[in-house]
């Protein structure tokens, strides 16, 4: 699986991936990335438009950041995005409008746990 940065020393806490070609996907991904950034979460936003989802996922694996948020096809169908925890392998779908708050809370809890 490769590198898995501990949250307290990772260069970024979260990588936000926008997949597909739908402009709405990129808009939502940017909104979530901005909200996370405003809340003090260190974010790497992959907004490359001419790169396939497979390449983005492979790059995310190589980077090994603690959390990945995927905005893609489920947004249009269900209004959800996916949060992936690198350490545990857990994947969960959350409503797009709650994703920033939930992920911010998750990062803060992980940072707090790492301090003790």
PLM regions and their residue ranges:
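NTP/phosphate- and nucleic-acid-binding module
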Residues: 1-116
């Amino acid at each position: 699986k490769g590198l898995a940065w501990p949250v307290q020393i990772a260069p970024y806490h979260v990588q936000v991936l926008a997949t597909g070609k739908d402009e709405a996907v990129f808009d939502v991904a940017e909104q979530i990335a901005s909200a996370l950034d405003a809340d003090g979460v260190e974010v790497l936003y992959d907004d490359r438009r001419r790169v396939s989802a497979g390449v983005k996922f492979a790059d995310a694996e190589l980077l090994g950041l603690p959390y990945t948020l995927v905005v893609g096809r489920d947004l249009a169908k269900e209004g959800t995005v996916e949060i992936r925890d690198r350490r545990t392998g857990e994947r969960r779908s959350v409503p797009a409008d709650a994703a920033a708050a939930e992920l911010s809370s998750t990062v803060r809890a992980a940072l707090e746990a790492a301090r003790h």
